[in-house]
Swiss-Prot record:
Post-translational modification: A soluble form (sIL1R1) is probably produced by proteolytic cleavage at the cell surface (shedding).
GO molecular function terms listed in the Swiss-Prot or TrEMBL record: interleukin-1 binding; interleukin-1 receptor activity; interleukin-1, type I, activating receptor activity; NAD+ nucleosidase activity, cyclic ADP-ribose generating; platelet-derived growth factor receptor binding; protease binding; transmembrane signaling receptor activity
Organism phylogeny: Eukaryota, Metazoa, Chordata, Craniata, Vertebrata
Disulfide pairings: 23-104, 44-96, 121-164, 142-196, 248-312
Catalyzed reaction equations: NAD(+) + H2O = ADP-D-ribose + nicotinamide + H(+)
Name under which the protein is recorded: Interleukin-1 receptor type 1
CDD domains listed in its UniProt record: Ig1_IL1R_like, Ig2_IL1R_like, Ig3_IL1R_like
InterPro entries per UniProt: Ig-like_dom, Ig-like_dom_sf, Ig-like_fold, Ig_sub, IL-1_rcpt_fam, IL-1_rcpt_I-typ, IL-1_rcpt_I/II-typ, IL-1RAcP-like_ig
Tissues expressing the protein: Expressed in T-helper cell subsets. Preferentially expressed in T-helper 1 (Th1) cells.
UniProt entry tagged with the keyword Transcription regulation: no
Stretches assigned to the Cytoplasmic side: 357-569
Self-association state and partner proteins as the record states: The interleukin-1 receptor complex is a heterodimer of IL1R1 and IL1RAP. Interacts with PIK3R1. Interacts with IL1A.
Disease named in the record: Chronic recurrent multifocal osteomyelitis 3: An autosomal dominant autoinflammatory bone disease characterized by early-childhood onset of bone pain and arthritis caused by sterile osteomyelitis.
Length: 569
């Protein structure tokens, strides 16, 4: 008996297999992606015009039907395929076969199960997209929840989340009705990913159900008129006779019209001076926000074009927009002229400062020689001498050094005879028997400058620190009367460390004028660089018109050496 039953079952399976081979084939194009580790139900996707019959489910190309035992994780319950729960490895192809006595249809469906992405409550592949228009109320539907009604035909209770955060159903902004989320007064801020979550009890065990919805807002579908982006009722400076283009940029639909007018008339196609070109750029995302461009080509600006504005019009069946450009004559750009003047003045000032730094001494001396006679005469300062000469004394009677020649002969020859200055030289201008201290003190006070002669020999430095003349002169110059001090180096002095502090201070603050070469050879002229430096530091001298520059000849120098009388220091 058992053998007979097995034989009958085998024959039935064989017949059903043969019948299945004769079935019509169809593939469902939509691939439904669901969350893994949740309960899931798949119906057989029959079209309304397709015949009804007995439904049997198969996995891949298996000839064995899916189990109908509810205890099996994947099984057929009534006409639907159940996954309790679904696993990632369950992804693949399934077939539902519809049979009746005269008809067989085999439908292929694809199922995919995915796990949630890291740090998210969903997987982007499982998203359902839903759209609602703005400025009104609308509802988001939690998909495929009708499969999970209980024995009372009631849907499971839903919990809603936005971007994985619990959503407050306050009946003001959001409210939940069955499998729907009602959104009041839809706005752009409501965009986002919404998740509906529920629990379903199957065979005494609870399983989760999750759907994720991408909420996309739609703009109000209101009729709009075109909008001119540019021009914006403006003026434009153009030269008479020039060639220009006026561009009208319009945002609207491709069916809108944009054109130019001048003096109330549209542009004639045969106008020899004015011509229009049209361009359009479609916006794939929003066809109502495309760009229309109308270019008005003006081959030559005529005087009549300054009288009336050029106006761009854009219109459709919902409205019209207009904007104009008024051509005007160019206004003189004073800013460019001011910039040019400022740049020129800056260059002149910089060059003047540079030239002054290089030729400062020559400029000052030229000014003194050329302009001093025209300036008002100042009140007398009570000074008798232009400079007091402080120099190292030669030790030994009858001996004459280069320093003595410079002090007693060269200095007077150039500064007094050629330049008209008056010098006080101790040993030349004092009288025998006078008190040294009194003479020095009195004549330093009567002098406008203190000239100190420096030599290289170490022995020549000793007089600076110990002589009464140096002490009195420096005191009057630096402390009491504030006389300007001028240092003259007859030779290059490498080290000032052995000099008195007062000399080092003057050297650091004002520097020193150094002689280069041999002053005992060749004639001396006040126009050389050394003497110009000395004259620059000397006070302004109103020279007598009869004074003439004289040169110190070699014969004169020999005579001066023979006649030089230097008192003992």
């Amino acid at each position: 008996m058992k053998v007979l039953l097995r034989l009958i079952c085998f024959i039935a399976l064989l017949i059903s297999s043969l019948e299945a081979d004769k079935c019509k084939e169809r593939e469902e194009k939509i691939i439904l992606v669901s969350s893994a580790n949740e309960i899931d139900v798949r119906p057989c996707p029959l079209n309304p015009n397709e015949h009804k019959g007995t439904i049997t489910w198969y996995k891949d190309d298996s000839k064995t039907p899916v189990s109908t035992e509810q205890a099996s994780r994947i099984h057929q319950h009534k006409e639907k395929l159940w996954f309790v729960p679904a696993k990632v490895e369950d992804s693949g192809h399934y077939y539902c076969v519809v049979r009746n006595s005269s008809y067989c249809l085999r439908i292929k469906i694809s199922a995919k199960f995915v796990e949630n992405e890291p740090n998210l409550c969903y997987n982007a592949q499982a998203i359902f997209k839903q759209k609602l228009p703005v400025a009104g109320d609308g509802g988001l539907v939690c998909p495929y929840m009708e499969f999970f009604k209980n024995e009372n035909n009631e849907l499971p209770k839903l919990q809603w989340y936005k971007d994985c955060k619990p959503l407050l159903l306050d009946n003001i902004h959001f409210s939940g009705v069955k499998d729907r989320l009602i959104v009041m007064n839809v706005a752009e801020k409501h965009r986002g990913n919404y998740t509906c979550h529920a629990s379903y009890t199957y065979l005494g065990k609870q399983y989760p159900i999750t759907r994720v919805i991408e909420f996309i807002t739609l703009e109000e579908n209101k009729p709009t008129r075109p909008v001119i982006v540019s021009p914006a009722n403006e003026t434009m400076e153009v030269d008479l006779g020039s060639q220009i283009q006026l561009i009208c940029n319009v945002t609207g639909q491709l069916s809108d019209i944009a054109y130019w007018k001048w003096n109330g008339s549209v542009i004639d196609e045969d106008d020899p001076v004015l011509g229009e070109d049209y361009y359009s750029v479609e916006n794939p995302a929003n066809k109502r926000r495309s760009t229309l461009i109308t270019v008005l080509n003006i081959s030559e600006i005529e005087s009549r074009f300054y009288k009336h504005p050029f106006t761009c019009f854009a219109k459709n069946t919902h409205g019209i927009d207009a904007a104009y450009i008024q051509l005007i004559y160019p206004v003189t750009n004073f800013q460019k002229h001011m910039i040019g003047i400022c740049v020129t003045l800056t260059v002149i000032i910089v060059c003047s400062v540079f030239i002054y730094k290089i030729f400062k001494i020559d400029i000052v001396l030229w000014y003194r020689d050329s302009c001093y006679d025209f300036l008002p005469i100042k009140a007398s300062d009570g000074k008798t001498y232009d400079a007091y000469i402080l120099y190292p004394k030669t030790v030994g009677e009858g001996s004459t050094s280069d320093c003595d020649i410079f002090v007693f002969k060269v200095l007077p020859e150039v500064l007094e005879k050629q330049c008209g200055y008056k010098l006080f030289i101790y040993g030349r201008d004092d009288y025998v028997g006078e008190d040294i201290v009194e003479v020095i003190n009195e004549n330093v006070k009567k002098s406008r400058r203190l000239i100190i002669i420096l030599v290289r020999e170490t022995s020549g430095f000793s007089w600076l620190g110990g002589s009464s003349e140096e002490q009195i002169a420096m005191y009057n110059a630096l402390v009491q009367d504030g006389i300007k001090v001028v240092l003259l180096e007859l030779e290059k002095i490498q080290d000032y460390e052995k000099m008195p502090e007062s000399i080092k201070f003057i050297k650091q603050k004002h520097g020193a004028i150094r002689w280069s070469g041999d002053f005992t050879q060749g004639p001396q002229s006040a126009k050389t660089r050394f003497w110009k430096n000395v004259r620059y530091h000397m006070p302004v001298q109103r020279r007598s018109p009869s004074s003439k520059h004289q040169l110190l000849s070699p014969a004169t120098k020999e005579k001066l050496q023979r006649e030089a009388h230097v008192p003992l220091g």
